[in-house]
Amino acid sequence: RQKKAMEMFGFPKENCFDSALELSRVPKFADAVINGTMDEQHVETSIPLLKKGYDMLLEKPFATNEKEMRELVSCVKENGNKVMISHVLRYTPFYLSIKERVASGEIGDIINIQTCEHVSYHHLSTSYVRGKWANSDVCHTSMLLAKCCHDIDLMMWMMSDTQPSMISSFGSKFQFKPENAPKEAGTKCLVDCPLVDTCRYSAKRLYLDQPKRWAFYIWDKLEGIENPTDEDRINLLKGDSNYGRCIYKCDNNVVDHQSVLVNFKNGATGTHNMVGGSAGPMRRIHIIGTKGEIYGDFEESKFTVAKIHPTKTDEKTVEVVDLNVNGDMVGAYGGHGGGDEKLAADFVEFLRGGKPSLACTSIFDSVA
């Protein structure tokens, strides 16, 4: 990967390193770094670079436990770095537009906020059953923190004038466990399973028949092959690839659905529901205020503003806002529904000392 990056972007060999620690041992030669390592590596890779004087755009969640969170915040305070957290969905036209309407007071004070995320069956099985975030002993994070820190952050952002006073949550590993496996199921889809052509979670159907789906996860071990063939892919899934395992017989220990209930200090409430294994991806939000409500679907990139109006025949005014931007992964405005590009631009402005945008999240905002 390092060699490929050198070729793509023209990096000189002396500016390529095998670790953050190795980078920290040479004289500082840039203003900032972008830390996009795995969740459990965020703190250990950030601290040497922060001590070296680099500012940073840090992927969320910026820490996976309270001890490391406090350690990182303390390091930033001691060294005076500018650290921005990559809460990219704040920058999407969908959520930013909703935040602006809420901040204007248009729907009054928020009484209740409801968010939900449905994780599609192929995303859940690839990332959270067979993949990198399937086992908390390996990735050192929970399903909620890994997948839904976006949604929890959005709830806190919309409720920025108050803080939680009490939180309760529960969930379970409902679907993907050995006792739910069909009796005929093998242990490896392409090796010993007679259901390889019919199971909806078959590695053949999910990955070989759709080789571009989640390719950056599934075929990562083939990166050294310039033009991998179908035979290369089959052999990988038959071999030691985690993605060739029976979906019901993996080492996953994270939940596949979870609900969260939040009570805020001002008396408002919030809920978040994460459900994995749905037919398609979905993120929704519904905010009810004292003057009206806002609700919408991120994937559809449209939301409705309904305001109380006693003299209207239907007792309310309704405005549908269609932003005409595709959802999470693709779109006319780039990845994450248009958020990626705006996040990068805001980070540059953040480094220059400009006025923070409504969406900007410093590390201190994240622990407030």
Predicted segments, located by residue:
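Rossmann-fold dehydrogenase core element
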Residues: 71-88, 108-115
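Predominantly a Rossmann-like dinucleotide-binding segment in NAD(P)-dependent oxidoreductases
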Residues: 89-245
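C-terminal helical cap and adjacent loop that interface with cofactors, partners, or active-site loops
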Residues: 9, 254-368
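Hydrophobic residues in well-ordered beta-strands that form the structural core
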Residues: 35, 58-59, 64, 83-85, ...
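Catalytic cores of eukaryotic secretory-pathway lumenal/extracellular enzymes that build
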Residues: 39, 43, 68-71, 90-92, ...
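Beta-loop-alpha module in the N-terminal Rossmann-like domain of NAD(P)-dependent dehydrogenases
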Residues: 9-75
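N-terminal Rossmann-like dinucleotide-binding module
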Residues: 1-11, 155
